[in-house]
Amino acid sequence: MLKTKDTVLEIDNIVKEFPVGKNGKMTACNKVSLCFEKGKTLGIIGESGCGKSTLMKIVMQLEKPTSGQILYHGEDITKLKGEKLRQHRRNIQMVFQDPTTAFNPKMKVKDIICEPLLNFGLIKKGEKEEVAKKYLEMVELPAEFMDRYPHNMSGGQRQRIGIARALVLDPEVLI
């Protein structure tokens, strides 16, 4: 792992083990170390079940590592809790593999896209349509989609809604 002055996120010796049976364990990530640099794209490849998604869930703090650190600008985010963790989540966003399960099916597209902004108090409810339109255009979907529900869209269209939602907070790291 080569850390530079442009390193934004550092994954340092991450191990994730899941209990199996009475005394067993299954290792999903075994001493993984990576650096994410500002302005760079990093692809993580591997066969099904090798731990790619688990690693990204650890970065997002949706899973806790068994050991190791995730450093964001030098701060170990695996130790964050409560409001500090919530504020940190503005900086790192994720586009989930299956957008169908990532969205509340009772929410319209404009609400899905704008929910993060409302949660952080960055827009008022009256601004949702303007913001949703901007981000729908960004992901090349028509503005009239904002009043649709995700189950009325194709898988590719739902994926683009997930991308728009992840981009709306202008994160420093996008997974």
List each model region and its residues.
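Conserved signature/switch motifs of ABC ATPase nucleotide-binding domains
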Residues: 151, 169
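ABC ATPase NBD coupling module
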Residues: 22, 77-93, 119
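Conserved ABC ATPase "signature" region
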Residues: 76, 127-144
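The feature captures the beta-strand-to-loop junction immediately N-terminal to the Walker
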Residues: 45-47
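Helix-to-loop junction immediately C-terminal to a conserved catalytic motif
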Residues: 60
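Conserved ABC transporter NBD signature motif
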Residues: 68-76
